[in-house]
Swiss-Prot record:
Function: 3-isopropylmalate dehydrogenase; part of the gene cluster that mediates the biosynthesis of pneumocandins, lipohexapeptides of the echinocandin family that prevent fungal cell wall formation by non-competitive inhibition of beta-1,3-glucan synthase. The 10,12-dimethylmyristoyl side chain is synthesized by the reducing polyketide synthase gloL/GLPKS4. The thioesterase gloN/GLHYD exclusively interacts with gloL/GLPKS4 to maintain turnover of the polyketide side chain.
Quaternary state and interactors: Homodimer.
Gene behind this protein: gloI
Site (Critical for catalysis): K194
Name by which UniProt lists this protein: 3-isopropylmalate dehydrogenase gloI
Matches recorded under PROSITE patterns: IDH_IMDH
Cofactor annotation: Mg(2+); Mn(2+)
Stated family: Belongs to the isocitrate and isopropylmalate dehydrogenases family.
Length: 373
């Protein structure tokens, strides 16, 4: 019996539709291989500026409801200079989507999908070679969602409240623990905080994380590190943080962007924002939002040169975490690595391939990989 998965697709703005086309191309190759077992029902919606132009809102209620009913969400990129003057920031469509789905746990891998990419890194090869980090960022709490007092026009004072509750920290810690347990041998977890000075994303965070790992993941090696020390280590010795990094919303926002410089291009990196904790990673379905970490690239959109790797690898993450197809995810990752090692690259990583050329090459490599399995 064929299993149907409903997937909501938000191509997004500027370069978003370009990379999304390559991601869907790869997803269709998986569907053809497994046509007797699975079917992907794709439902397209607008988000961000594209939605604002048509619906006068960054995301419609219909799009939100369809996303909530779907198995997973794929997203290209949101925003751009065309909509700088809108009454409501068009980027808020993504925030509303995350909130509506309660996407609490952001996962960002930081590694080299192809070993030769170490030569493209902003860092020295001997510093970053062997880096393999997965960052788990809590997405729904912290200072971004706390009470806010804007300045009164005199620019004398303003405030933002950093607030966390126990439940928000617990589920982020559990997600990190499950990720660590899913690998053999189990991965170490480094929790980042500011426990020497701050209450919420400091001492409360550290105390709750410590308790969760002591009671639920006693075999996982847990260490705590101050965020400023971690930021230094990302630049100086990133391999010392190999494994899982767990941290709060704002700290995760900053440290993940810093770490994204390691592989050499923002176009290489995927992300997942999960809405639940899998019972067993790689074997359970969890609704999530899957998107590359790069922006909409308005400066190069329409030229056919954007790197679609992050989007394609986001499709792989969707197959792994939301559709319970880990072998297919592994095959996509292997195909991407082979294509890059065979020197089919977009310009941001030293090649001349177009966006579509790269996607086509991945599909060919993927078919060969799937035929061997």
């Amino acid at each position: 019996m064929t299993k149907q998965f409903d997937i909501v697709v938000f191509p997004g703005d500027y370069g978003g539709p370009e990379v999304m086309a390559e991601g869907i191309k790869v997803l269709k190759a998986i569907e053809r291989k497994h046509q007797s077992d699975v079917s992907f029902n794709l439902k397209y919606h607008l988000i961000g500026g594209a939605s604002f132009d048509i619906h006068d809102t960054p995301i419609t209620t219909e799009a939100l409801e369809d996303a909530k009913a779907a198995s997973a969400v794929l997203l290209g990129a949101v925003g751009g200079p065309k909509w700088d003057g809108t009454p409501v920031p068009v980027e808020s469509g993504l925030g509303r989507l995350r909130k509506f789905l309660d996407a609490f746990g952001n996962i960002r891998p930081v590694n080299f999908i192809a070993p030769s990419l170490v030569n493209c890194s902003s860092f020295k090869e001997h510093v970053v070679s062997g880096t393999d980090i997965t960052i788990v960022r809590e997405l729904t709490g912290g200072i971004y969602f706390g009470a806010r007092q804007e300045h009164d026009g005199s620019f004398n004072s303003a405030s933002d409240l950093d607030h966390y509750d126990r439940d928000s920290i617990v589920r982020a810690a559990r997600l990190a623990g499950k990720l660590a347990m899913s690998r053999q041998p189990h991965l170490p977890v480094t929790s980042l905080d500011k426990a020497n000075l701050l209450a919420a994303c400091g001492r409360l965070w550290r105390g709750v994380v410590k308790e969760v790992f002591e009671t639920e993941f006693p075999t996982i090696k847990l260490s705590h590190m101050l965020i400023d020390t971690a930021a230094m280590n990302v630049a100086r010795r990133p391999t010392s943080l190999n494994g899982i990094i767990l941290t709060s919303n704002m700290f995760g926002d900053i440290i993940s962007d810093e770490a994204s410089a390691i592989p050499g291009s923002l176009g290489l990196l995927p992300s997942a924002s999960l809405c639940a904790i899998p019972t067993v990673l790689d074997a359970s379905k969890v609704r999530g939002i899957y998107e590359p970490i790069h922006g909409s690239a308005p400066d190069i959109a329409g030229q056919g040169i954007i790197n679609p790797t992050g989007m394609i690898l986001s499709v792989a993450m969707m197959l792994r975490y939301s559709l319970a197809m880990p072998e297919a995810a592994d095959s996509i990752e292997a195909a991407v690595g082979k294509v890059i090692e065979d020197d089919c690259r977009t310009s941001d990583i030293g090649g001349r391939a177009s966006t579509a050329d790269f996607g086509d090459a991945v599909v060919i490599a993927l078919r060969n990989c799937l035929d061997k399995n």
